[in-house]
Amino acid sequence: AMAGLTSQPAMNSIVAALQHSDRDTGIDPDKIQKISEYWRDVRPVYAGFESELVTSSAEIYKYEIPGGQYSNLKPQVESFGLGHKFEDVKNMYKTVNQMLGDIVKVTPSSKAVGDMAIFMVQNDLTPENIYEKAANMDFPDSIVSYFEGMMGQPHGGFPEKLQKLVLKDKKPITCRPGELLPPEDFDGI
């Protein structure tokens, strides 16, 4: 009752799918059904916190948008007055991810990809025209932080031309961001 939608599949589904196979979990489906029924009854209490997504969707695999971000992306897109372009933003998310080198998307890197996708749709940018049209634009803070190296160094490195466009005259770090923190004063705590 708490899974599905943009989350992982419900445990009941996994247990049932693996039953009578060499990967049978040995979990009693009737016992976990009781847990599901409990959460089915509790879930309405939290209805105010639910996203508008009320059905399961495999789009998260198509666009490679993490489930938690997917459920927050639509309200974020709407907050920019781009609700009518939500499909464009989802497609751009996949495009931006490829522009960045098909990065691992977890908070905060997934936010950087999403912010850049919204920015590009908002400004009618494409991978082809971004270098001339965006030369004098200020990019979202999250994407600047990403290219500065503050989210770490991506496997395969940064796409240099895009990094220079985003950072302008700023220099990226080349070490692990945590190495820049001062030592913790445990005696002073």
Predicted regions and their residues:
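A short, ordered amphipathic alpha-helix with a cationic face
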Residues: 3-5, 60-64
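Functional cores that coordinate and move charged inorganic groups
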Residues: 1-54
